């Protein structure tokens, strides 16, 4: 597959936390370039808690709140054209819930939402977090990527 400009489809259907859509594109492009991932498209949706819980119930028969849902589409290396890496559905409100006891500043909130997006993309790339060892490995990878994104000023912003 030849690498064309990646189409990053971003939909912000929540109003709780402002998300600068250009920062989403920058994070995704920086991450995919860093990991040497070739794809044509990726879809990112920022949803309200209620909408994400409804999707969680529809996809996994579990109506509980969650921070992110990932639906991989084409596996890395799949010759499909156009190659669609997957869809990430993220609740920015989950970051507020997660950080509610820590007196977070704006930077903390956007870093946590950035973590959710990185987490989803890692799932699209085949990472799993069902066992405690897989969770540990995935968290280490997330932390490495967040450090790289921070250095490149590629975390999400308002």
Curated annotation (Swiss-Prot):
Q: Which GO terms describe its biological process?
A: rRNA processing
* Primary location: cytoplasm
Q: What is its EC number?
A: 3.1.-.-
Q: How is the cofactor bound?
A: Binds 1 zinc ion.
Keyword rRNA processing carried by entry: yes
The entry's localization annotation reads:
Cytoplasm
For this protein, the record's Pfam families field holds: YbeY
Q: Does the keyword Transmembrane feature in the UniProt annotation? A: no
Cofactor(s) this protein cannot do without: Zn(2+)
What molecular functions are annotated in GO for this chain? metalloendopeptidase activity; RNA endonuclease activity; zinc ion binding
Q: Which UniProt keywords apply?
A: Cytoplasm, Endonuclease, Hydrolase, Metal-binding, Nuclease, Ribosome biogenesis, rRNA processing, Zinc
Function, in words: Single strand-specific metallo-endoribonuclease involved in late-stage 70S ribosome quality control and in maturation of the 3' terminus of the 16S rRNA.
The name this protein goes by in its record = Endoribonuclease YbeY
User: What species does this protein belong to?
Assistant: Chlamydia pneumoniae
